[in-house]
A protein has these predicted regions:
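Acidic, low-complexity cytosolic segments
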Residues: 1-23, 32-165
Length: 165
């Protein structure tokens, strides 16, 4: 993975996670699985995994929409026991991915995602990848990676931590 994400745009998604209740992490991912911007607290190795999963799910959503002749997909939701993964299309195949607590207000989260995409869609477009500085290198741990609780950030912002993450 090239790891060419826009560190100077991370504040957009970090601000989103700070403002929206029960949201732990957010990332903007290109169609080809490259993290374009990341919220605070996402380790590099987790960003790579999240990017691959997000681009894969976005591709599946696009394939389903094509087969069912249902127009372009705008949003997808993966509901798990320990939390939600919400994916929203931005432009040119890029996506905003949000990890939230299982009992979050999904309507509020989806609304805030739409506001972010509308307000910052051009800024977050994949065309900026070519100008991206630096890269990410996963930590060296002898082949092991520490477990991450994807929603640990949500627990710090809410009175009661999410049920599982």
């Amino acid at each position: 993975m090239s790891g060419a994400y826009r560190q100077d745009l991370n504040w957009l998604v970090s601000d989103f996670t700070a403002r929206v209740p029960d949201v732990a992490h957010a990332a903007v991912i290109s169609a080809d699985g490259v993290p374009l911007s990341l919220s605070d607290g996402i380790p590099p190795y987790f960003a790579e995994q999240l990017a691959a999963i997000t681009s894969g799910l976005a591709s599946l959503m696009q394939g389903a929409a094509r087969i069912f002749e249902a127009g372009l997909p705008t949003q997808g939701l993966v509901e798990m026991e320990g939390g939600l993964m919400i994916i929203k299309a931005i432009s040119d195949g890029s996506s905003l991915c949000v990890l939230a607590a299982p009992d979050c207000d999904t309507e509020l989260v989806a609304y805030e995602m739409s506001v972010l995409v509308e307000a910052a869609g051009e800024v977050l477009s994949p065309a900026l990848r070519g100008a991206s500085p630096g890269g990410m290198t996963p930590p060296s741990m002898g082949g092991r990676r520490p477990p991450i609780s994807p929603l640990q950030g949500a627990a710090a912002k809410t009175a009661a931590p999410p049920s599982r993450w």
